[in-house]
Amino acid sequence: KRKNNIAINRNLSEQAKILYKEWFIDFGPFEGEMPGDWHLGTVEEIIELHDSKRKPLSGRQRDDMEKIYPYYGATSIMDYVDNYIFDGIYLLLGEDGSVIDTEGYPILQYVFGKFWPNNHAHVITGEKGFSVEMLYLLFSLTNVQSIVTGAVQLKISQQNLKTVEVVIPSYEAITEFDEMIQPIFREIRRLRTENDKLTTLRDNLLPKLMSGELDVSDLDI
């Protein structure tokens, strides 16, 4: 079930990326040309950064905490902690360490609910009508190799991130497209939530089965 949900979500994400490329890179619905009321701008115009609210926790601090809310690093969940800083839908973009994939695209995490990020990922929401979902698609299709600094420890600074050139559509186009993709991302969130519950159930039941505390030998399966 979990593997199936992961595969479905991967497919849903790819569908959304194809739609974004068709609209905002290939300009398919607009006869292959960028409409006159759109413009080339920079990332600074369309994002809000929440990095100042981040707070890293040491391994020792986390060891003493109850494991409730995800603690995010640059690329993934690193641990679970007993409190949270953010509650909602956000985009995490790797700031240092593993910041790009082998092709130069940024490492992204589409996160929702209550969570605590460390200081290795930028915490982003949208401006000018851009939803987090649209930003996720935009950055998924934007090569950022040229703004990465550092030879040993790679880094995408706030300043450099803000300079990335992007197509900024009209508010009407943004709204219309966002209405198309929101059902896709609602399903992605639903399936991820279902997987989280399945994982919790497995983690709770497995030790009991292994220890013999839970006996299923009499179940008619």
Predicted feature descriptions by range:
Residues 34-35, 39-169, 220-221:
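DNA target-recognition domains and sequence-specific DNA-contacting regions of bacterial/archaeal
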Residues 1-56, 61-73, 167, 171-216:
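Non-catalytic DNA-recognition/assembly elements of restriction-modification systems
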